[in-house]
UniProtKB/Swiss-Prot annotation:
Function comment: Catalyzes the conversion of dethiobiotin (DTB) to biotin by the insertion of a sulfur atom into dethiobiotin via a radical-based mechanism.
Keyword 4Fe-4S: yes
Binding sites annotated in the UniProt record for [2Fe-2S] cluster: 100, 131, 191, 263
Residue ranges occupied by any Radical SAM core domain in the UniProt entry: 41-265
PANTHER family from the UniProt entry: BIOTIN SYNTHASE (PTHR22976), BIOTIN SYNTHASE, MITOCHONDRIAL (PTHR22976:SF2)
Binding site for [4Fe-4S] cluster: 56, 60, 63
Pfam families from the UniProt entry: BATS, Radical_SAM
Functional pathway: Cofactor biosynthesis; biotin biosynthesis; biotin from 7,8-diaminononanoate: step 2/2
Substrates-to-products reaction catalysed: (4R,5S)-dethiobiotin + (sulfur carrier)-SH + 2 reduced [2Fe-2S]-[ferredoxin] + 2 S-adenosyl-L-methionine = (sulfur carrier)-H + biotin + 2 5'-deoxyadenosine + 2 L-methionine + 2 oxidized [2Fe-2S]-[ferredoxin]
Protein name in the entry: Biotin synthase
Species of provenance: Shewanella woodyi (strain ATCC 51908 / MS32)
InterPro entries, per the entry: Aldolase_TIM, BATS_dom, Biotin_synth/BioAB, Biotin_synthase, Elp3/MiaA/NifB-like_rSAM, rSAM
Gene (name only): bioB
Length: 354
């Protein structure tokens, strides 16, 4: 098999041509590349905690954490460090290798930085990788977090540059690119992806992946989120995205960015086991683990581990999460999969989802 060539000069029409391939051809190409770089049966597991919820001043149309929309979400202040550590211990015990902390901010304030750095240091002392998503970062803030030991910083591009203005007006596309540049310059790893199912056109999905793949250095982690339509947000009544379009997006991301972790992110709660299996085959090799993604639902741990067992997958580093390996748990997960099999629907990505 030929050696994989990393490219940073993808043209839009080249990417659109990949999306247009017959499904079997696309999946074959993506999976072949995936096998060359990664163990195809290993999935990296992260746990995500909202450390500050709601009252965000931004106007992202998909997000229930925006103060501009009445979604019934109760806002919370920055939580105490000990609560963060309790959640991190639980995550590690359940098999997560990375702990992600998200805050619904436009950007962190100077008064927040000491607490954030302490969170990073304490979680790292447990032997876990750390990730944060706090909004925009200045070069100095990125440097402070890097010095504290933060491994990853998430800041998504959300969609293509052309469609971006229809999604958010309070932060520019260049603002997002600048934050990613600050993160990379500080020596941290970049986590950046986007959301599909927001009413975008096919060319916008190509445009999003083009932006990511043409960065000077590919993101280390690329989360692909499916919109979860939340009542009270402007996007609550959008039509569902075809599940196979989502699978195609995963596959094209794997082809364009062979060495990046492609994360099957928000939206798994509404995906059938069969759809998730196709995503793993297409090149997804990272998930969020636990019953919540910031403010939205996520499959329970035992359901994920039951699915892993059925598919012959294992968590990164070969560490299995705790699972009640009994008939009742298996039957519960199977029943849920059957119940939603014919109800494929879009799922939601939060403002700080990774």
């Amino acid at each position: 098999m030929s050696e994989i060539q990393l490219r940073h000069d993808w043209k839009r029409d080249e990417i659109e041509a990949l999306f247009a391939l017959p499904m079997n051809d696309l999946l074959f190409e993506a999976h072949s590349i995936h096998r060359q770089v990664y163990d195809p049966n290993e999935v990296q597991i992260s746990r995500l905690l909202s450390i500050k919820t709601g009252a965000c001043p931004e106007d992202c149309k998909y997000c229930p954490q925006s103060a501009r929309y009445d979604t019934g979400l109760e806002k919370e202040r920055l939580i105490e460090i000990e609560k963060v550590l309790t959640e991190a211990r639980s995550a590690k015990a359940a098999g997560a290798s990375r702990f992600c902390m998200g805050a619904a901010w436009r950007n962190p304030h100077a008064r927040d930085m000491p607490y954030l750095k302490d969170m990073v240091r304490e979680v790292k002392s447990m032997g876990m990788e750390t990730c944060m998503t706090l909004g925009m970062l200045s070069p100095d803030q990125a440097g402070e977090l890097a010095e504290a030991g933060l491994d990853y910083y998430n800041h998504n591009l959300d969609t293509s540059p052309e469609y971006y203005g229809d999604i958010i007006t309070t932060r520019t596309y260049q603002d997002r690119l600048d934050t990613l540049s600050n993160v990379r310059a500080a020596g941290m790893k970049v986590c950046s992806g986007g959301i599909v199912g927001m009413g975008e056109q096919a060319t916008d999905r190509s445009g999003l992946l083009q932006q990511l793949a043409n960065m000077e250095q590919h993101p280390d982690s690329v989360p692909i989120n499916m919109l979860v339509k939340v009542a009270g947000t402007p996007f609550e009544n959008l039509e569902d995205l075809d599940p196979l379009v989502f699978v195609r997006t995963i596959a094209v991301a794997r082809i364009l960015m062979p060495h990046s972790r492609v994360r099957l992110s928000a939206g798994r709660e509404k995906m059938s086991d069969e759809m998730q299996a196709m995503c793993f085959f297409a090149g997804a090799n990272s998930i969020f683990y636990g019953c919540k993604l910031l403010t939205t639902n996520n499959p329970e741990e035992n359901e994920d581990m039951t699915l892993f067992k059925r598919l012959g997958l294992h968590p990164e580093q070969g560490k299995y999460a705790t699972i009640e390996d009994d008939k009742a748990v298996f039957e519960k997960a199977t029943a849920k999969a059957n119940a939603i099999k014919d109800k494929q629907s879009s799922a939601f990505y939060d403002a700080a989802a990774l």
